[in-house]
Amino acid sequence: MARLQEHYQTVVKKALLEKFQYGNVMEIPRLEKIVINMGVGEASQDRKLIEGALTDMTAISGQKPIITRAKKSIAAFKLREQMIVGCKVTLRRDRMFEFLDRLVTIALPRVRDFRGVSAKSFDGRGNYNMGLKEQIVFPEIDYDRVDKVRGMDITICTSAKSDEEAKALLEGFAMPFMK
């Protein structure tokens, strides 16, 4: 069992139960999945760029990402239908908890001028979205082998009904929100 998963079972669940007074233990919010998306728009012109993104994403997440393709053609972006535009990976269970642990304890503190993540990035349904400007904050990425600095979007999906509950859940995992 992952360290953060154990922490959730022993500490976070009890704290949430006391704070929100749930009638049933199944109502307590939990993490459902984490989706990491890396947009590589330049891959539509140069096919080799997606390979670097796939390698980085595999190292960060621990599983093979799927390639995302354009749903429709957009002439302004020189984009045709089914062209490669990025890659994404969906993490669940142990890998999800291990990734969140590495994100909170290692990657976020390595971000330049980091003051905390925004508390306004909840979507109203208990999910949290954030972006990282560079993939080199993760220790799995070798700085010398990076062909291009790419950012990524991270979506943390929870079973929480409200943003307040989701924020309390993520604070239980030591997510560093801005004051």
UniProtKB/Swiss-Prot annotation:
GO-annotated biological processes: translation
One Gene Ontology cellular component annotation held by this UniProt entry: ribonucleoprotein complex
Protein's recorded name: Large ribosomal subunit protein uL5
HAMAP family: Ribosomal_uL5_B
GO molecular function terms attached to this record: rRNA binding; structural constituent of ribosome; tRNA binding
Species in which this protein is naturally found: Rhodospirillum rubrum (strain ATCC 11170 / ATH 1.1.1 / DSM 467 / LMG 4362 / NCIMB 8255 / S1)
Annotated InterPro entries: Ribosomal_uL5, Ribosomal_uL5_bac-type, Ribosomal_uL5_C, Ribosomal_uL5_CS, Ribosomal_uL5_dom_sf, Ribosomal_uL5_N
Gene: rplE
Keywords annotated in UniProt: Ribonucleoprotein, Ribosomal protein, RNA-binding, rRNA-binding, tRNA-binding
Functional description taken from the UniProt entry: This is one of the proteins that bind and probably mediate the attachment of the 5S RNA into the large ribosomal subunit, where it forms part of the central protuberance. In the 70S ribosome it contacts protein S13 of the 30S subunit (bridge B1b), connecting the 2 subunits; this bridge is implicated in subunit movement. Contacts the P site tRNA; the 5S rRNA and some of its associated proteins might help stabilize positioning of ribosome-bound tRNAs.
Transmembrane segments: none
Subunit structure: Part of the 50S ribosomal subunit; part of the 5S rRNA/L5/L18/L25 subcomplex. Contacts the 5S rRNA and the P site tRNA. Forms a bridge to the 30S subunit in the 70S ribosome.
Disulfide bonds: none
Family: Belongs to the universal ribosomal protein uL5 family.
